[in-house]
């Protein structure tokens, strides 16, 4: 990481226009204030300073009274307050493309001190050129950026001095994409840590390239005013570049700079190494961070650190203290055609021309660029307009503490299913897609809420050992790729049904859930006190494991009870008198032993409470593409005669159970028929399309029959198959041609060959389960009857499905309804192949905006309880 160089104290002219009285932040100077201690916690305020109710702006303004690093001198008398960080009328709007990645400051980094919630700006800044233009700008009539604060903020830019902390912007890069800016709150705190590092080290290292050669040498004479650069001190030209010079490890040993919590508290930035690390999960790919000082016009992408540092040093050495233009808010700058460069600076592969103090252009020195520049200049075009790239000093929007995130009041643990062994880290990417979709929905539908929902991935598979490599050693070599794919995906189902390895899978997920919750609470100590809620989103097999953890279901214990009952029923037909006498004594002894055990267990239960499997209560349990219903049916769960969720998941364990599935997902099954059997003939609730206007709340949607009877008092075998429309405000279409295509969204998220294999298998089952895709209205009644057979209830709990009281409109009578609907179905697309959907639908939930809206609707539901109840009449 390159760092700006040293300089003399700021000229009083910079602050003269606003009544300043001294030098402000000075990069690398001996009069620089020291900021020791923690970065993530604002714990440096002396006695009598503002506490929890005020933001410690002194950290960024350098106010007197700050604690200094050991051995540092107090030079606070040199520092002046910067009004841009305290002005009540200061306007700010983040230009960060990912600015919706929010977090809150209370309890950051292990539960440090808190800062008050700041009032949002009244008028957002809309830069005049942030959305247009290219990297190579600078032609006649080029539009310029607008600083916040209007003309009143102009005075602090009259004189060229070092960039203030609010003008610098820090960036990060993920997946080798473009640089993304941190929000203002994060950028200011990273800059604070960076300046703390500068003050604590006091080093003057020379930047070197990987070969050990200096890259920050004196500038080559390239213009009329460049000769004086050679007389500059070497350190002034090079600046402070410890990480690039290879001194990062040495600094880390000598100076302990605490990492800065950023991006909603999900990541931490290490300014010593110049990298960003996730907090709650492991990630092999490094996320570099960069300090931006000079930016490309139009895109506002930062220049590379080496070049930016050199240009900044040259700019300060040449123009320090000089007057800038009269007004910074000029909408259109004067064309530079015909202007001669007043200063030039040679870089390794480029050179920079200054046409004025704030008109700077970057040119490539590649041979092709030189030829093109020569040709265009002969055609009458200026050098800048033909091949120059306009540069800006300082970011388009200044960083402010007001640009801070909302408070997290709801966390969502995202649990993966099978296939993670084959594609480790996939759940992290899937959670990132779900988080990004949720941010878009929050900005669109829940922007007026002061709270925030955060998604955390739960990766439990990679830490398990299971059988080691035993299965791999017995796998034949033929079609090895397909076999390895099955071993890495479908084998997880075999492991979970095995009594030997099932406990390892359950404990692996249970420990990871508790670890993440404990870590989150340690970094957010007020989460539980303020009533924070926890939900779980599970996919595929993860739904079954999560369910068993919450309910404590253990097949080994049930098997032991079954064996015990069988032992108590021996065959007495061929027993002698002596054998029967001994058997009676054995029964008496066992009964006495059982009574003693029960008394002992009772004493233990009264003296200590049983530790729950999870350290938190689950508010909502969302199942996506879940086979949970099949597992419950095979365990003997049969429909009851009440419509309560407690029949399969007690409310004291989980407040709400919701089952989300795509109609063609071959792995997903319905849960409602396990509670009330006749719900197999009631259509699942259709999930609203994310851009549906004024959708009816789900709790007010009446259930409708899949096959409504002609006779309103009975359901015959030759019943019609027309679908009664659901009471939604969207246009009434058939269920197959209604709403968003989840498959189209999911084509980009086919999770490897394992998912394709599962999808192909599901496609074959779908082929035999349906007559054809060209006859969607003839959804086989035989297949429905076949699905009813394995879950047929005993005679004592059977709910009659031949005489169901319902209204003439085709809706079920409320006496036989569920307390809350559980099955929610995504809508199929207008143009969609069911065979292709069978391949892709199981992995298409992560990026769906429909799913994101559905999740957030129930998580924010407690804030909508006071809304006016809409009409219950069917649409």
From Swiss-Prot:
Q: Which InterPro entries match?
A: DDHD_dom
Q: Which residues form the active site?
A: 540
What is an example of a Pfam family matching this protein?
DDHD
The yes or no answer to whether the keyword Hydrolase is present is yes
Q: Where is the composition biased (Low complexity)?
A: 217-228
Listed Basic and acidic residues bias regions? 779-790
Q: What pathway or pathways are given for this protein in its record? A: Phospholipid metabolism; phosphatidylinositol metabolism
Reaction(s) the record says it catalyses: a 1,2-diacyl-sn-glycero-3-phosphate + H2O = a 2-acyl-sn-glycerol 3-phosphate + a fatty acid + H(+); a 1,2-diacyl-sn-glycero-3-phospho-(1D-myo-inositol) + H2O = a 2-acyl-sn-glycero-3-phospho-D-myo-inositol + a fatty acid + H(+); 1-octadecanoyl-2-(5Z,8Z,11Z,14Z-eicosatetraenoyl)-sn-glycero-3-phospho-(1D-myo-inositol) + H2O = 2-(5Z,8Z,11Z,14Z-eicosatetraenoyl)-sn-glycero-3-phospho-(1D-myo-inositol) + octadecanoate + H(+); a 1-acyl-2-(5Z,8Z,11Z,14Z-eicosatetraenoyl)-sn-glycero-3-phospho-(1D-myo-inositol) + H2O = 2-(5Z,8Z,11Z,14Z-eicosatetraenoyl)-sn-glycero-3-phospho-(1D-myo-inositol) + a fatty acid + H(+)
DDHD domain: residues covered: 614-861
Q: What GO molecular function annotation could you give as one example from this UniProt entry?
A: phospholipase A1 activity
The compartments listed are:
Cytoplasm
Q: Which ranges are annotated Polar residues under compositional bias?
A: 795-804
Q: Where is this region: Disordered?
A: 1-30, 101-153, 206-231, 770-804
Tell me which SMART domains the record gives.
DDHD
| EC number(s) on file | 3.1.1.111, 3.1.1.32, 3.1.1.118
Keywords assigned by UniProt, alphabetized? Cytoplasm, Hydrolase, Lipid metabolism, Phospholipid metabolism, Phosphoprotein
Here the segments flagged for biased composition (Gly residues) are 130-140
What's one GO BP annotation on this UniProt entry?
phosphatidylinositol metabolic process
GO cellular component terms, semicolon-separated: cytoplasm
Q: Which residues carry this modification: Phosphoserine?
A: 8, 11, 726
Tissue expression: Expressed in mature testis.
Task: Report the sequence similarity comment from the record.
Answer: Belongs to the PA-PLA1 family.
Subunit structure of this chain's protein: Forms homooligomers and, to a much smaller extent, heterooligomers with DDHD2. Interacts with SEC23A and SEC24C.
Quote the function comment for this protein: Phospholipase A1 (PLA1) that hydrolyzes ester bonds at the sn-1 position of glycerophospholipids producing a free fatty acid and a lysophospholipid.
Protein name per Swiss-Prot or TrEMBL? Phospholipase DDHD1
Give the species this sequence originates from. Answer: Bos taurus
Q: What is the lineage of its organism?
A: Eukaryota, Metazoa, Chordata, Craniata, Vertebrata
Primary gene name = DDHD1
